[in-house]
Amino acid sequence: MITIIDYGKTNSNEIAESLEKLSVEFVISNKESDILQANKLILPNSTDISSSIKKLHLLNLFSILRIVEKPILGIGTGMHLMTKSFKDINAACLGYFPVECKTEEAQQNIFVHEQSIKIIKGTSLLNNISKEDKFYFEGDCFIPRNECTTSVVSIGSEITSTIEREHLYGIQFRPERSGEPGLQILKNFLEI
């Protein structure tokens, strides 16, 4: 079973629709028991990362998420929550990836568009993805390219579009708005 973690103002329902297309058993929840019983977790995109961090703390999920050892996929700001910190709001995040999430350089290049990604490291999350496939990006936050980056997208400069470390995965784009390539990414995560 997959648990999509509900920390308020997320795109959980859109992710749920995509998982339904893949005939996957899932639950949208913020209960500790659902997180611990799940085989895999999804941290969905949120409209406000600061509120998401606060909500995870209020629900006492921050500590649990830091120690759980199961595959986790962060989507959009869900991926940003997986970094060590969010520089612009001076907030500690989950610390899965040893890099800061930023907005300052992206402010001039707020991106809302479909774009292909450049794969720089082969990974199971990117199986059956080609350089012609386009993904839907939106937002003004980003993770700089780093040692965990597996693909990049160019918004003037190259930024991380996918990131991976052990059982932890993050994607900058929105798979539920990326058609078949987005569904393929979700399918790949489910098969990990």
Locate each region found by the language model.
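Short hydrophobic-aromatic micro-motifs
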Residues: 74, 135-138, 168-172
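C-terminal and late-domain segments of enzyme folds
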Residues: 142-192
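Structural motif
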Residues: 42-44, 170
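Structural alpha-helical scaffold elements that stabilize or flank donor/cofactor-binding regions
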Residues: 34-35, 64
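Cysteine-nucleophile active-site neighborhood
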Residues: 47-113
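An anion/phosphate-binding loop that grips the pyrophosphate of nucleotide cofactors and donors
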Residues: 38
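N-terminal beta1-alpha1 ligand-phosphate binding loop
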Residues: 2-24, 30, 173-177
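Pocket-forming structural segment of enzyme catalytic cores
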Residues: 86-159
